[in-house]
């Protein structure tokens, strides 16, 4: 990036820093002035300072040249906010302050205006600590204090004490803002909804500022005052922007369709590798466009969204980048992986809440989505197809892991391809928190780029172009790009079946796999904010906040839900999960994850899950396939469901948790834990009766009465009162309805698995 764009980025990102200082000190003057004065104390950069000081329409200066960057920051702020702020007051205005400003309000939940129902939930005033418990929104209103803001202001000032405001430190400041300002509301106007954080608004303002700069530069227009201030309403009509997106296809097959007993060791490495590939695709594209991560709205699960300038150069760069990266994928993965880019132009009016319609907002995303879909149908041009066909069938053996026939080598007594050999090495590095991009050392991740995990203390010894850090914010000297990764791992995959046994050696020796994802997330993303207020809440800032909320839940907090459980998170995208572990802990994890997800989204979104039960030597590909079928069975049950072990045991989530997991299973444990082996053997007879109820209903009721009487005789005298309660309860389950019988059958089966001795 050239110096002018770097200054523009910092000015746009810091334009509202005065709000933090103003709330900390209570100063009664424009936040733009407060922010600029504060900045001048810590840095010597007049261009950045002027953007902070003059980014408000009612505080422009005749001293500014027509080509001053402050005009770009001004209109970018308006677009990011979704309103034209020429007529707005602010917190320091004496007349308006008492009436409309709630200076210390805490941030509202993004899901308050999501879906059809309006809610009032708020976040606790805090920083974003990735190691602490999730900051769940609640109905409790707990405002900030001056002291809270003073602590935030002090931390920012301390972090920026040695800051150079150059290109190398851009990611550091983005990290700092996300860590400190994610629960600080951008607007405290009581007539607005304070659900957009200052971190998100500042980031989006910087994104639009950089895109506007490129757009006007391309057209040779440098009278920013005229174009962006005097004639701002005309600029809002110009299709100055592109919403660009990419989709990386083949992720599921790449991770799960692997053979051999040693493949399990690669499983997490393959997943993490593709996570970083998506990150690298995004960063590489931004580098080529002379942009940074402010322009990246979202990345995760093989998808990403960007705000870019609508110029021929941008489109040419997208086309060439897509071509080059697919050449890399073809050379290393043949047709197993493919990346498709899509984009669509839009004007500021299409995303500004006072000017847009829900339909125009959806169309922005649909343009990009349609282009991607068309490319995925027809992936390769004629020349590429001819080259692929000319290769014919290789005479070499297949890679014993991924079945590739290209570039095979011998490694650990196996015939493997170069990529799988690299993944073996990478699997030893995934415990590190830092991952570097080098030119030629490590696992190929893009054209002339390799990925390598490195211990923190050895970073200074390495040569790299970029460093990523997992689940941690690093500002200052490290200059790292943080990435969210769901990577909890208790033990090696092959050990989980044995770990299903308790300390007494009881429990069926099986592992379990869960696959789950959010129901109808695509529709929710495009239209979730359109159902209230005639679509006025459909804004880019809310879409970006929504996406980051999903990433935070599924890539960070998921590690906490898994902690202390015997399982490994293999894959956690922005909305879907694949995990392997002891079968008891996989069920417990799924229940905990689902209940926390309902709490996180206030019940506005649901998820569906399939859980499969397998012997420890079952091929990964088979486990993934069969569990995927169970997930589909859950989706087929009108979603918000779980399918456990077999599609026969498919329940609505609430029904499974309330009636089976927390009730019937507990009742069965309470009684049968006091029975000897003879008593426990009757469980199989009870299961058989439940399964055969329809065949001979009257006869089976009589058999049940007989079995329960025999079971009572085997029960110790001091336990018989307890048994009578169970007898009455079970008879009710059996005779009540099919739902109760199916729930009782699964509860008994789960208990049998808990007490098996094999």
From Swiss-Prot:
HD domain: annotated span: 1-82
One Gene Ontology term from the biological process aspect of the record: defense response to virus
Cofactor stoichiometry and binding remark: Degradation of ssDNA requires Mn(2+), Co(2+) or Ni(2+); Mg(2+), Ca(2+) or Zn(2+) do not activate ssDNase activity. Formation of cOA requires Mn(2+), Co(2+) or Zn(2+), Mg(2+) is not as efficient.
Catalytic reactions on record: 6 ATP = cyclic hexaadenylate + 6 diphosphate
Keyword Zinc-finger: no
Regulation: ssDNase activity is activated by target RNA binding to the Csm-crRNA complex and is inhibited by EDTA.
Keyword hit for Membrane: no
Molecular function terms from GO: ATP binding; endonuclease activity; exonuclease activity; RNA binding; transferase activity
Domain GGDEF residue range list: 509-647
The entry's keywords: Antiviral defense, ATP-binding, Endonuclease, Exonuclease, Hydrolase, Nuclease, Nucleotide-binding, RNA-binding, Transferase
Cofactors demanded by this protein: a divalent metal cation
Pfam families listed in its UniProt record: Cas10-Cmr2_palm2 (PF22335), Cmr2_hel_dom2 (PF20824), Csm1_B (PF18211), HD (PF01966)
UniProt record similarity statement: Belongs to the CRISPR-associated Cas10/Csm1 family.
Subunit structure: Part of the Csm effector complex that includes at least Cas10(1), Csm2(3), Csm3(5), Csm4(1), Csm5(1) and mature crRNA. The Csm complex is elongated and slightly twisted with a maximal length of 215 Angstroms and a diameter of 75-80 Angstroms. It has been modeled to have a central protein filamant of Csm3 subunits along which the dsRNA helix of paired crRNA and target RNA binds. The filament is capped at one end by Cas10 and Csm4 and at the other end by Csm5; ssDNA is thought to bind to the N-terminal HD domain of Cas10.
Main function: CRISPR (clustered regularly interspaced short palindromic repeat) is an adaptive immune system that provides protection against mobile genetic elements (viruses, transposable elements and conjugative plasmids). CRISPR clusters contain spacers, sequences complementary to antecedent mobile elements, and target invading nucleic acids. CRISPR clusters are transcribed and processed into CRISPR RNA (crRNA). Csm functions as a non-specific ssDNase. Base-pairing between crRNA and target RNA to form a ternary Csm complex activates a ssDNase activity; target RNA cleavage suppresses the ssDNase, a temporal control that prevents uncontrolled DNA degradation. Viral RNA transcripts probably tether the Csm complex to the viral genome, recruiting Cas10 ssDNA activity which is able to degrade DNA in the transcription bubble, spatially controlling the DNase activity.
Domain text: The N-terminal HD domain has ssDNase activity. The C-terminal GGDEF domain has the cOA synthesis activity.
Remarks, miscellaneous: Encoded in a type III-A CRISPR locus.
Name the UniProt record assigns to this protein: CRISPR system single-strand-specific deoxyribonuclease Cas10/Csm1 (subtype III-A)
Originating organism: Streptococcus thermophilus
Gene: cas10
